């Protein structure tokens, strides 16, 4: 299944140490369900939970490499941790998530971007020298997620 926040925090700390030790890159995707509050208001919290479970399954399907990690970050926010993935690789995974979620075709009549549930994705790809802490990479991904939302949602922002 999908990891919780505590497990994510511990894996992320270790991956940052490993990245610095081996001088590799690390990509982190932050995802947020578009118009999720409206979804809950219309379809109810049980359907909201079901929607998040389906998204969780999509995220697990899209993280194929053994070191990749899909985690619930909080609310309707999720994180994909992709050790040693460059920006291009991270983008490929983000596009795969959006494609697989579209195929789930979860109805969302109050979305202004599509008739089904969509996500916005912020990507942070860093090298050892770029960050000091887990908070640093999360902050970058969060800023890019905010940018994806301000660009009209249902999109990916990586710089």
Per-region residue spans from a language model:
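Catalytic core regions of nucleotide second-messenger enzymes
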Residues: 99-119
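Hanks-type protein kinase catalytic core
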Residues: 66
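Short, hydrophobic secondary-structure boundary micro-motifs
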Residues: 28, 109-110, 156-159
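A structural signal for short, well-ordered beta-strand segments
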Residues: 28-31, 78, 119-123
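Conserved long alpha-helical elements within nucleotide-processing catalytic cores of c-di-GMP signaling
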Residues: 1-27, 37-60, 71-75, 79-80, ...
């Amino acid at each position: 299944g999908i990891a919780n926040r505590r497990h994510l925090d511990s894996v992320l700390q270790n991956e940052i140490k490993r990245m610095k030790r081996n001088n590799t890159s690390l990509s982190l995707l932050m995802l947020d369900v578009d118009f999720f509050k409206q979804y809950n208001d219309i379809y109810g919290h049980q359907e909201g939970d079901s929607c998040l479970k389906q998204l969780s399954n999509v995220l697990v399907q899209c993280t194929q490499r053994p070191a990749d990690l899909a985690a619930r970050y909080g609310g309707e926010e999720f994180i994909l941790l992709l050790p040693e993935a460059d920006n291009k690789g991270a983008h490929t995974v983000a596009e795969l998530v959006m494609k697989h979620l579209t195929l789930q075709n979860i109805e969302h009549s109050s979305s202004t971007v599509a008739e089904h549930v969509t996500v916005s994705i912020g990507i942070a790809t860093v090298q050892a020298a770029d960050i000091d802490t887990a908070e640093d990479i999360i902050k970058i991904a969060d800023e890019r997620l905010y940018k994806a939302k301000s660009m009209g949602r249902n999109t990916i922002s990586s710089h």
